[in-house]
Regions:
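HKD-type phospholipase D/PLD-like phosphodiesterase module
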Residues: 34-69, 75-220, 234-325
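Short, low-complexity, Pro/Ser/Thr/Gly-rich segments in the mature regions of secreted, periplasmic
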Residues: 326-335
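Ser/Thr-rich, Pro/Gly/Ala-heavy low-complexity intrinsically disordered linkers and tails
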Residues: 1-38
Length: 336
Protein backbone atom coordinates (compact mmCIF):
# COMPACT_ATOMS: atom_id res chain seq x y z
CA UNK A 1 0.00 0.00 0.00
CA UNK A 2 1.08 3.63 0.33
CA UNK A 3 3.95 4.80 2.46
CA UNK A 4 5.14 8.14 3.76
CA UNK A 5 7.80 9.94 1.80
CA UNK A 6 10.61 11.34 3.95
CA UNK A 7 9.49 14.90 3.27
CA UNK A 8 6.01 14.21 4.51
CA UNK A 9 7.10 12.40 7.64
CA UNK A 10 8.16 15.83 8.85
CA UNK A 11 4.75 17.26 7.99
CA UNK A 12 2.50 15.11 10.12
CA UNK A 13 2.77 12.38 12.70
CA UNK A 14 1.58 8.88 11.88
CA UNK A 15 -2.06 8.32 12.77
CA UNK A 16 -1.71 5.03 14.58
CA UNK A 17 -1.94 6.50 18.05
CA UNK A 18 -4.87 5.94 20.34
CA UNK A 19 -7.58 8.61 20.26
CA UNK A 20 -7.13 11.27 22.90
CA UNK A 21 -8.98 14.40 23.91
CA UNK A 22 -12.08 15.32 25.81
CA UNK A 23 -13.92 12.12 24.97
CA UNK A 24 -13.17 9.28 22.59
CA UNK A 25 -15.50 7.73 20.03
CA UNK A 26 -18.04 5.17 21.16
CA UNK A 27 -17.08 1.52 20.73
CA UNK A 28 -19.35 1.12 17.71
CA UNK A 29 -18.32 4.37 16.01
CA UNK A 30 -15.81 2.88 13.56
CA UNK A 31 -17.62 0.35 11.38
CA UNK A 32 -15.29 0.69 8.39
CA UNK A 33 -11.82 0.44 9.92
CA UNK A 34 -10.21 -0.63 13.21
CA UNK A 35 -8.52 2.69 13.87
CA UNK A 36 -6.86 5.76 12.40
CA UNK A 37 -4.47 3.72 10.25
CA UNK A 38 -1.32 5.00 8.61
CA UNK A 39 -1.06 8.31 6.81
CA UNK A 40 -1.28 7.36 3.12
CA UNK A 41 0.56 10.46 1.98
CA UNK A 42 2.80 9.14 -0.77
CA UNK A 43 2.73 11.56 -3.73
CA UNK A 44 -0.47 11.48 -5.77
CA UNK A 45 -0.22 10.43 -9.40
CA UNK A 46 -1.63 13.85 -10.30
CA UNK A 47 -2.27 16.96 -8.26
CA UNK A 48 -5.93 17.50 -7.37
CA UNK A 49 -7.97 20.44 -8.58
CA UNK A 50 -9.33 22.71 -5.86
CA UNK A 51 -12.32 25.01 -6.07
CA UNK A 52 -14.15 27.57 -3.97
CA UNK A 53 -17.86 28.23 -3.63
CA UNK A 54 -20.19 29.84 -4.27
CA UNK A 55 -18.87 31.42 -7.49
CA UNK A 56 -19.49 29.08 -10.41
CA UNK A 57 -20.32 26.17 -8.14
CA UNK A 58 -23.58 25.05 -9.74
CA UNK A 59 -22.05 25.22 -13.21
CA UNK A 60 -19.07 23.17 -12.00
CA UNK A 61 -21.30 20.50 -10.46
CA UNK A 62 -23.45 20.42 -13.58
CA UNK A 63 -20.40 19.88 -15.77
CA UNK A 64 -19.09 17.10 -13.55
CA UNK A 65 -22.42 15.27 -13.56
CA UNK A 66 -22.88 15.77 -17.29
CA UNK A 67 -19.36 14.42 -17.86
CA UNK A 68 -20.12 11.03 -16.30
CA UNK A 69 -20.02 8.31 -18.95
CA UNK A 70 -20.30 5.01 -17.09
CA UNK A 71 -20.96 5.43 -13.37
CA UNK A 72 -22.00 8.23 -11.02
CA UNK A 73 -22.24 7.81 -7.26
CA UNK A 74 -23.41 10.71 -5.09
CA UNK A 75 -23.60 10.91 -1.30
CA UNK A 76 -25.13 14.14 -0.03
CA UNK A 77 -26.32 15.37 3.35
CA UNK A 78 -28.70 18.00 1.93
CA UNK A 79 -29.96 18.03 -1.67
CA UNK A 80 -32.51 20.68 -2.66
CA UNK A 81 -31.28 21.99 -6.04
CA UNK A 82 -33.70 20.32 -8.43
CA UNK A 83 -31.68 21.42 -11.47
CA UNK A 84 -28.84 19.16 -10.30
CA UNK A 85 -31.33 16.36 -9.70
CA UNK A 86 -32.45 16.83 -13.30
CA UNK A 87 -28.84 16.40 -14.49
CA UNK A 88 -28.53 13.19 -12.46
CA UNK A 89 -31.75 11.91 -14.03
CA UNK A 90 -30.41 12.84 -17.47
CA UNK A 91 -27.24 10.87 -16.73
CA UNK A 92 -29.31 7.84 -15.80
CA UNK A 93 -31.41 8.21 -18.94
CA UNK A 94 -28.32 8.22 -21.17
CA UNK A 95 -27.15 4.94 -19.68
CA UNK A 96 -24.93 5.98 -16.78
CA UNK A 97 -25.20 3.67 -13.76
CA UNK A 98 -26.27 6.17 -11.09
CA UNK A 99 -26.64 5.69 -7.33
CA UNK A 100 -27.56 8.35 -4.77
CA UNK A 101 -27.33 8.22 -0.96
CA UNK A 102 -29.14 10.88 1.08
CA UNK A 103 -29.31 11.55 4.80
CA UNK A 104 -32.61 10.05 5.96
CA UNK A 105 -33.34 12.59 8.68
CA UNK A 106 -33.04 15.84 6.75
CA UNK A 107 -36.53 16.91 5.66
CA UNK A 108 -34.94 19.11 3.00
CA UNK A 109 -34.16 15.98 0.99
CA UNK A 110 -37.78 14.94 0.55
CA UNK A 111 -38.50 16.74 -2.73
CA UNK A 112 -35.34 15.61 -4.51
CA UNK A 113 -35.64 12.07 -3.12
CA UNK A 114 -39.17 11.83 -4.51
CA UNK A 115 -38.01 13.24 -7.84
CA UNK A 116 -35.12 10.80 -8.17
CA UNK A 117 -37.13 7.76 -7.14
CA UNK A 118 -39.92 8.79 -9.52
CA UNK A 119 -37.38 8.83 -12.35
CA UNK A 120 -36.12 5.34 -11.37
CA UNK A 121 -32.75 6.61 -10.15
CA UNK A 122 -31.49 4.12 -7.54
CA UNK A 123 -31.67 6.13 -4.31
CA UNK A 124 -31.14 4.99 -0.75
CA UNK A 125 -31.13 6.50 2.69
CA UNK A 126 -27.79 6.47 4.45
CA UNK A 127 -27.41 3.65 6.97
CA UNK A 128 -28.21 4.08 10.65
CA UNK A 129 -24.57 3.40 11.56
CA UNK A 130 -24.08 7.15 11.95
CA UNK A 131 -25.70 10.00 13.85
CA UNK A 132 -25.87 11.90 10.55
CA UNK A 133 -24.69 11.13 7.05
CA UNK A 134 -23.07 14.54 6.63
CA UNK A 135 -20.62 13.69 3.81
CA UNK A 136 -20.75 15.55 0.49
CA UNK A 137 -18.95 13.78 -2.37
CA UNK A 138 -19.23 12.26 -5.83
CA UNK A 139 -17.39 9.41 -7.54
CA UNK A 140 -17.41 9.67 -11.33
CA UNK A 141 -16.61 6.73 -13.65
CA UNK A 142 -14.36 5.25 -10.99
CA UNK A 143 -11.77 7.81 -12.11
CA UNK A 144 -12.51 10.99 -10.15
CA UNK A 145 -13.65 11.77 -6.61
CA UNK A 146 -15.14 15.16 -5.71
CA UNK A 147 -14.74 15.83 -1.97
CA UNK A 148 -16.15 19.04 -0.53
CA UNK A 149 -17.89 20.99 2.21
CA UNK A 150 -20.76 22.00 -0.08
CA UNK A 151 -24.23 20.52 0.05
CA UNK A 152 -26.40 20.53 -3.05
CA UNK A 153 -28.60 23.25 -1.59
CA UNK A 154 -29.53 26.67 -2.94
CA UNK A 155 -27.46 28.63 -0.42
CA UNK A 156 -24.31 26.67 -1.26
CA UNK A 157 -24.71 27.71 -4.88
CA UNK A 158 -25.35 31.38 -4.10
CA UNK A 159 -24.13 32.71 -0.76
CA UNK A 160 -22.00 30.27 1.25
CA UNK A 161 -18.21 30.05 1.49
CA UNK A 162 -17.14 26.47 0.86
CA UNK A 163 -14.12 24.57 -0.41
CA UNK A 164 -13.70 21.40 -2.44
CA UNK A 165 -11.28 19.27 -4.40
CA UNK A 166 -11.34 16.89 -7.35
CA UNK A 167 -8.82 14.06 -7.12
CA UNK A 168 -8.07 11.62 -9.91
CA UNK A 169 -5.44 9.71 -7.98
CA UNK A 170 -6.39 5.99 -8.18
CA UNK A 171 -5.88 5.39 -4.45
CA UNK A 172 -8.01 8.37 -3.43
CA UNK A 173 -10.75 7.36 -5.84
CA UNK A 174 -10.68 3.71 -4.78
CA UNK A 175 -10.93 4.64 -1.10
CA UNK A 176 -13.82 7.02 -1.76
CA UNK A 177 -15.56 4.37 -3.85
CA UNK A 178 -15.13 1.81 -1.07
CA UNK A 179 -16.78 4.16 1.42
CA UNK A 180 -19.71 4.72 -0.92
CA UNK A 181 -20.08 0.99 -1.63
CA UNK A 182 -20.12 0.21 2.07
CA UNK A 183 -22.77 2.82 2.85
CA UNK A 184 -24.82 1.84 -0.20
CA UNK A 185 -24.93 -1.78 0.93
CA UNK A 186 -25.67 -0.92 4.55
CA UNK A 187 -28.35 1.56 3.51
CA UNK A 188 -30.09 -1.17 1.55
CA UNK A 189 -30.06 -3.67 4.39
CA UNK A 190 -27.31 -5.72 2.76
CA UNK A 191 -24.20 -7.01 4.51
CA UNK A 192 -21.70 -4.21 3.93
CA UNK A 193 -18.11 -4.90 2.95
CA UNK A 194 -16.03 -2.71 5.28
CA UNK A 195 -13.98 -0.11 3.44
CA UNK A 196 -10.27 -0.90 3.76
CA UNK A 197 -8.95 2.38 5.11
CA UNK A 198 -5.88 0.96 6.86
CA UNK A 199 -3.71 3.33 4.83
CA UNK A 200 -5.50 6.24 3.21
CA UNK A 201 -5.05 9.94 2.50
CA UNK A 202 -8.70 10.50 3.33
CA UNK A 203 -10.00 11.99 6.56
CA UNK A 204 -13.02 9.86 7.40
CA UNK A 205 -15.55 10.03 10.19
CA UNK A 206 -16.24 8.19 12.33
CA UNK A 207 -12.98 6.27 12.21
CA UNK A 208 -9.95 8.58 11.82
CA UNK A 209 -11.05 12.22 11.60
CA UNK A 210 -10.62 13.31 15.22
CA UNK A 211 -7.08 11.96 15.48
CA UNK A 212 -5.97 13.14 12.07
CA UNK A 213 -7.26 16.68 12.29
CA UNK A 214 -5.90 17.17 15.79
CA UNK A 215 -2.51 15.80 14.69
CA UNK A 216 -2.59 18.03 11.63
CA UNK A 217 -3.08 21.14 13.75
CA UNK A 218 -0.29 19.97 16.05
CA UNK A 219 2.00 19.57 13.02
CA UNK A 220 1.91 23.31 12.23
CA UNK A 221 5.38 24.81 12.54
CA UNK A 222 5.05 28.43 11.36
CA UNK A 223 1.51 29.19 10.16
CA UNK A 224 -2.03 27.96 10.81
CA UNK A 225 -5.16 29.43 9.21
CA UNK A 226 -8.65 28.30 10.20
CA UNK A 227 -11.92 29.20 8.46
CA UNK A 228 -14.87 27.43 10.03
CA UNK A 229 -18.57 27.60 10.69
CA UNK A 230 -17.86 26.72 14.32
CA UNK A 231 -15.27 25.07 16.54
CA UNK A 232 -16.84 23.13 19.40
CA UNK A 233 -14.61 20.09 19.99
CA UNK A 234 -12.29 20.53 22.97
CA UNK A 235 -9.30 18.75 21.46
CA UNK A 236 -9.39 20.90 18.33
CA UNK A 237 -9.72 24.08 20.41
CA UNK A 238 -6.80 23.06 22.62
CA UNK A 239 -4.60 22.17 19.65
CA UNK A 240 -5.19 25.60 18.09
CA UNK A 241 -4.38 27.37 21.36
CA UNK A 242 -1.26 25.23 21.80
CA UNK A 243 -0.12 26.12 18.29
CA UNK A 244 -0.24 29.80 19.22
CA UNK A 245 1.64 29.14 22.46
CA UNK A 246 4.51 27.43 20.62
CA UNK A 247 4.93 30.41 18.31
CA UNK A 248 2.82 29.49 15.29
CA UNK A 249 1.19 32.43 13.48
CA UNK A 250 -2.51 31.55 13.90
CA UNK A 251 -5.49 33.30 12.27
CA UNK A 252 -9.12 32.27 12.64
CA UNK A 253 -12.26 33.28 10.73
CA UNK A 254 -15.56 32.16 12.28
CA UNK A 255 -19.18 32.47 11.27
CA UNK A 256 -20.77 35.39 13.12
CA UNK A 257 -22.99 33.24 15.31
CA UNK A 258 -23.61 33.25 19.04
CA UNK A 259 -22.49 29.61 18.96
CA UNK A 260 -18.95 30.93 18.53
CA UNK A 261 -18.96 33.40 21.44
CA UNK A 262 -17.19 31.02 23.81
CA UNK A 263 -14.48 29.90 21.40
CA UNK A 264 -13.89 33.46 20.20
CA UNK A 265 -13.35 34.51 23.82
CA UNK A 266 -10.98 31.57 24.38
CA UNK A 267 -8.89 32.34 21.32
CA UNK A 268 -8.77 36.08 21.92
CA UNK A 269 -7.66 35.54 25.51
CA UNK A 270 -4.76 33.49 24.17
CA UNK A 271 -3.67 36.14 21.68
CA UNK A 272 -5.19 34.53 18.58
CA UNK A 273 -6.67 37.04 16.13
CA UNK A 274 -10.27 36.10 15.32
CA UNK A 275 -12.51 37.69 12.70
CA UNK A 276 -16.17 37.24 11.87
CA UNK A 277 -17.04 36.20 8.33
CA UNK A 278 -17.75 39.00 5.89
CA UNK A 279 -20.60 39.22 3.39
CA UNK A 280 -20.94 35.44 2.92
CA UNK A 281 -22.29 32.71 5.19
CA UNK A 282 -19.30 30.71 6.40
CA UNK A 283 -20.07 27.03 5.87
CA UNK A 284 -16.42 26.01 5.37
CA UNK A 285 -14.44 23.60 7.53
CA UNK A 286 -10.97 24.69 6.45
CA UNK A 287 -7.52 24.25 7.95
CA UNK A 288 -4.30 25.38 6.28
CA UNK A 289 -1.05 24.51 8.08
CA UNK A 290 2.27 25.56 6.51
CA UNK A 291 0.81 25.52 3.01
CA UNK A 292 -1.05 22.20 3.34
CA UNK A 293 -4.85 22.41 3.33
CA UNK A 294 -7.63 20.25 4.72
CA UNK A 295 -10.97 20.37 2.92
CA UNK A 296 -14.02 18.26 3.61
CA UNK A 297 -17.37 17.91 5.30
CA UNK A 298 -16.20 17.60 8.92
CA UNK A 299 -17.33 20.34 11.26
CA UNK A 300 -15.17 20.67 14.34
CA UNK A 301 -17.55 18.99 16.79
CA UNK A 302 -17.39 15.68 18.63
CA UNK A 303 -20.41 14.38 16.72
CA UNK A 304 -18.92 15.25 13.35
CA UNK A 305 -15.52 13.81 14.17
CA UNK A 306 -16.57 10.55 15.85
CA UNK A 307 -20.21 9.72 15.14
CA UNK A 308 -21.18 10.97 11.67
CA UNK A 309 -20.29 9.79 8.20
CA UNK A 310 -17.97 12.54 6.99
CA UNK A 311 -15.30 12.73 4.31
CA UNK A 312 -12.36 15.05 3.75
CA UNK A 313 -8.81 15.04 2.43
CA UNK A 314 -5.53 16.92 2.59
CA UNK A 315 -4.19 19.01 -0.28
CA UNK A 316 -0.43 19.09 0.05
CA UNK A 317 0.45 19.94 -3.56
CA UNK A 318 1.54 23.62 -3.77
CA UNK A 319 -0.50 24.80 -6.77
CA UNK A 320 -3.97 23.61 -5.68
CA UNK A 321 -3.25 24.47 -2.05
CA UNK A 322 -2.35 28.01 -3.14
CA UNK A 323 -5.86 28.46 -4.58
CA UNK A 324 -7.28 27.79 -1.13
CA UNK A 325 -4.71 29.95 0.65
CA UNK A 326 -5.44 32.88 -1.65
CA UNK A 327 -9.16 32.66 -0.93
CA UNK A 328 -8.43 32.64 2.79
CA UNK A 329 -6.32 35.78 2.37
CA UNK A 330 -9.17 37.47 0.50
CA UNK A 331 -11.67 36.45 3.16
CA UNK A 332 -9.37 37.57 5.96
CA UNK A 333 -9.06 41.01 4.43
CA UNK A 334 -12.84 41.28 4.00
CA UNK A 335 -13.75 40.02 7.48
CA UNK A 336 -13.89 41.96 10.72
Amino acid sequence: MRYLSLALIALVACGGATNTGDDGPPADAAPDAPGPGCWGLSPRTAAPETFVGPTGLQQRMTSLIDGAQQTLDVQMYLFTVTALADRIIAAKNRGVAVRVILDPDHAGNDTVRTKLVGASVPTRNAPTLYSFSHAKYLVIDGKAAVIMSMNFNVDAMSSERNYGMITRDPDDVADTQAIFDMDWAAGGGEAPKPADLACTRLVVSPNNAKQRLTDFIKSAKTKLDVEAMYIAEDGVRAAIVDAKKRGVDVRVILETSSDNTEVRTLFTANGIPVKGAGSFYLHAKLLVADGVAFVGSENFSITALTKNRELGAFVFEPTPAAVIQQQFETDWAASN
